Design a protein with these regions (language model features):
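Short connector loops at secondary-structure junctions
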Residues: 28-37, 136-144
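Cofactor-binding loop segments of dinucleotide-utilizing enzymes, especially the Rossmann-like FAD-
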Residues: 2-3, 32, 106
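N-terminal beta-loop-helix "entrance" segment that forms/cooperates
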Residues: 32-49, 146-147
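Helix-loop-strand module that forms the ligand-binding subsite of alpha/beta enzymes
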Residues: 47-127
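A generic structural motif
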Residues: 22-29, 130
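Glycine-rich phosphate/pyrophosphate-binding loop and the adjoining helix
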Residues: 130-176
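N-terminal beta1-alpha1 ligand-phosphate binding loop
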Residues: 1-25
Length: 176
């Protein structure tokens, strides 16, 4: 998740996607809020921060990655960009390589994080993350899609299920 907020809309969206997974699939939320900013000077076995090592090992063990992020100034939050950078290094040892990806953006605004969605996709192309193209997952006006108990409303869940089913089909075809 690209958001650090305690009551993040994107956290609610990510949790809703996780609950929709069919039997036999497991979701893991990989911690990124503790990652020191990437600095190539620290890229030695003796100096690499333990958080980088933990993060890389966790992502390396995943079969695919679902990125759920807000949009900040038509781009992704710095914490998410930093996680992409940490995972992509050292060069030639990227943890992202060939992992099927899904990009979901949620925003209180009407265009649903369109700028962040496409900016993230640009980075994922370079990182060699094959990403589901259709259906696109822009969740606009997200504040109106959450009920008084903090849950995503039913009609939106069916849209999420359509996206998730397409991603799982895409991912399975890539890994067969």
């Amino acid at each position: 998740m690209g958001s650090l907020r305690k009551d993040s809309y994107n956290k609610k969206v990510a949790e809703a996607f996780a609950k929709l997974l069919p039997e036999g699939y497991e979701s893991v939320f990989v911690k990124i809020d503790d990652l020191p900013f990437y600095n190539e000077d620290l890229e030695t076995p003796e100096q690499a921060p333990a958080e980088w090592t933990r993060f890389r090992e966790e992502v390396r063990g995943l079969d695919g990655v679902v990125f759920v992020t807000p949009e900040y100034n038509r781009s992704v939050p710095a914490v998410l960009k930093n996680a992409l950078d940490v995972g992509s290094r050292p060069y030639g040892h990227s943890v992202w390589d060939h992992k099927p990806g899904l990009v979901v953006t949620a925003s209180p605004g009407g265009i649903g994080g369109f700028g962040a969605n496409h900016h993230l996709r640009q980075s994922l192309v370079f990182l060699n993350v094959p990403t589901l193209q259709q259906p696109e997952a822009y969740i606009g006006n997200v504040a109106n899609l959450i009920d008084e108990n903090g849950n995503i409303v039913e009609g939106t869940l069916s849209f999420f299920q359509t996206i998730l089913d397409a991603y799982l089909d895409f991912s399975n075809k890539l890994t067969e």
